[in-house]
């Protein structure tokens, strides 16, 4: 183990000088040795500047760092604990416990920088994963072992949707889950912990947090730490759920680090290596012949612009995209999923079956026609429409309302008990609306309910 000294500190960027014959490799973890708050601070090598000097990023607060401090090279990249000892625990980017429940007691540690599985090891699946959320199961069904993105601007419900998915899938799913909190609010991490504890599934979840208040190094690497833990479970032959909230903050941390390292920015100020960094992470989130990783990732959309380089780069890696819309949220329809913008590779008659495909297609066709007619209605009113178009509008408004659903995780705020709707009931309900079986029911009866049976019950009560 070679030792060096700190020669320059600029915020989270620390330059360390080593003897010429013992220069650390890129991604090696270095440790500060000294008095005060910086003792034990981990630095990750990013660049070799020549002359024995390496440029590193601090994986913690750099307060109190000064020139001349001794630095020891660990000789390997950052490692995190893996295996069953991590379940039920909250850890930071370095795999250190932050839940005040004693040491992790792991039997094994893995380095966080690993190569993605080779083509021959990977396996794809067409098995559907039922979420119990009508709009998702119908329009953008998830695949077991697939990658799903929840796209949305600020305050349209990404985290609430993710919490509901965790609630519905993690509880019903007998496998294990890993939750990586990347640059999100500490309060949400806290809420998640108690949500899991109250529902009795805490012993099946490993949590890794690098929240908003932490330096960019932590936020850039915490997704890799969480993924490494998930990979270990997958390689043991288990089916793992990986939740990442939020992928955009991972990109943002990369932008901060890139600027600190003095790289020339590219489009909209993002790092020039944006596509590569995203690829390194996303290519590792995959299923192999041994086990599967099903991942759900929240993606913040800056200024509601889906063409922004960060969400646009993420799109390419996903099997299903759930787009949350501010316009739909403003109508009071939650989950605010846009059925016309959301897509899934699984929505194919060979995978979901002809009936499901036809109903989903029918719903999208009716909603698209309603969208086109809105301008005519705004100028001329409903009376100028043909009878056929009037029927389309009435059915579209019912479909729009029927796409809303009370969530289990939002019971406290809404006062309505949460509803889980099976795929069979979802298809039956929307098929009935498209066929005109419920044309006689008022559209208010379709709002915030579970299955179509509840709509009929609600309509009968109002009579």
Swiss-Prot record:
Gene3D superfamilies membership: 2.40.10.170, Bovine Mitochondrial F1-atpase, Atp Synthase Beta Chain, Chain D, domain 3, P-loop containing nucleotide triphosphate hydrolases
Cellular component annotations (GO), alphabetically ordered: plasma membrane; proton-transporting ATP synthase complex
InterPro entries: AAA+_ATPase, ATP-synt_VA_C, ATP_synth_F1_bsu, ATPase_a/bsu_AS, ATPase_alpha/beta_chains, ATPase_F1/V1/A1_a/bsu_N, ATPase_F1/V1/A1_a/bsu_N_sf, ATPase_F1/V1/A1_a/bsu_nucl-bd
UniProtKB keywords: ATP synthesis, ATP-binding, Cell inner membrane, Cell membrane, CF(1), Hydrogen ion transport, Ion transport, Membrane, Nucleotide-binding, Translocase, Transport
Chain sites annotated for binding ATP: 152-159
Membrane topology designation: Peripheral membrane protein
Reaction(s) catalysed (UniProt annotation): ATP + H2O + 4 H(+)(in) = ADP + phosphate + 5 H(+)(out)
Group of enzyme by EC: translocase
SUPFAM superfamilies, A to Z: C-terminal domain of alpha and beta subunits of F1 ATP synthase (SSF47917), N-terminal domain of alpha and beta subunits of F1 ATP synthase (SSF50615), P-loop containing nucleoside triphosphate hydrolases (SSF52540)
Subcellular location field: Cell inner membrane
One Gene Ontology molecular-function label: proton-transporting ATP synthase activity, rotational mechanism
Pfam families noted in UniProt: ATP-synt_ab, ATP-synt_ab_N, ATP-synt_VA_C
Superkingdom of source: Bacteria
Main location: membrane
Annotated NCBIfam families: atpD
Name under which the protein is recorded: ATP synthase subunit beta
Gene source species: Shewanella baltica (strain OS155 / ATCC BAA-1091)
Lineage: Bacteria, Pseudomonadati, Pseudomonadota, Gammaproteobacteria, Alteromonadales
